[in-house]
Amino acid sequence: MEKAMKYAKIAGSGGYLPERVVTNDDLAAELATRQISTSDEWIVERTGIRQRHLAERGVTTSQLATEAARRAMDDAGVQADEIDMIIVATSTPDYVFPSTACLVQANLGAKGGAAFDVQAVCSGFVYAMTTADNFIRAGRARCALVIGAEVFSRILDWNDRGTCVLFGDGAGAVVLKAADEPGILAAHLHADGSQTKILCAAGNVAYGDVTGDPFLRMDGQAVFKQAVTVLDRSARDVCAEAGVEVDDIDWLIPHQANVRILNFLARKLRVPTERVVITMDQHANTSAASVPLALDVARRDGRVKPGQLVLMQGVGGGFTWGSVLARM
């Protein structure tokens, strides 16, 4: 008898943010001590960001990821011994190796299953979700923990007004479980390696020394132009694969990069802004954590409900992008 195909369904979500909240006014005051001028009005007008959470010294990506994972597991009602795969999307791992996923596995007391990291910057969570979905569909996993976690504050040049105001730290997670009915309907992943220089942190560690530029650098205008183009096309492609129209989407949860990008994308897709989940005003850009954090907020406040159609999108350095369409 032919084995029935299993699908991956979101069974629970969780988010975790560092305790320290830094408002735009707080940040402006700190930057002013170094003769760098900015203001709450300047930041909000250009980005939509009002505050961000920053990890204290000594707090690691794996710690944030573990807390988000525990909340997602509680929400899903699963125990550590049920988790047979952990994927962490991060660009700010604790170590060169072992992977952050292995550290999370140990923290949770999960044993024996696969654990590895995915590095696709702000697209990382979408890449990780798609990877876990493929494992579950292939029958190679039944209960996967997918996490996006970052401490981007560690790789920012705090003398660069154009980037240091944009980012925050945090972690978000989902539990994907094998199900008879589709949860994840379709997913598309893409990259264009010729665009590496528009968003990168090009430093590396060799022979005990940091070589190159260790800080995040970004060409904001180029990122905007690329992001709105590829996300629009990706959304239409993933909907077409699933046999639905963009109008059928109940919620759009894009990477929380910049309110201008989100508003422009919503207009191109003709998705009303009231159906776009926006959290960057409170979280700033948390890179791979932004989509799962936004999903968790919208699930817990009752906006995202079971049975609804949710489109999640990531876009980031590489240049990478992707979309996941899921029935909740």
From Swiss-Prot:
GO terms for cellular component: cytoplasm. The keyword Repeat does not apply. Pfam families: ACP_syn_III, ACP_syn_III_C. GO terms for molecular function: 3-oxoacyl-[acyl-carrier-protein] synthase activity; beta-ketoacyl-acyl-carrier-protein synthase III activity. Residues 256-260 are annotated as: ACP-binding. The last Arg residue of the ACP-binding site is essential for the weak association between ACP/AcpP and FabH. Belongs to the thiolase-like superfamily. FabH family. This is Beta-ketoacyl-[acyl-carrier-protein] synthase III. It comes from Bordetella pertussis (strain Tohama I / ATCC BAA-589 / NCTC 13251).
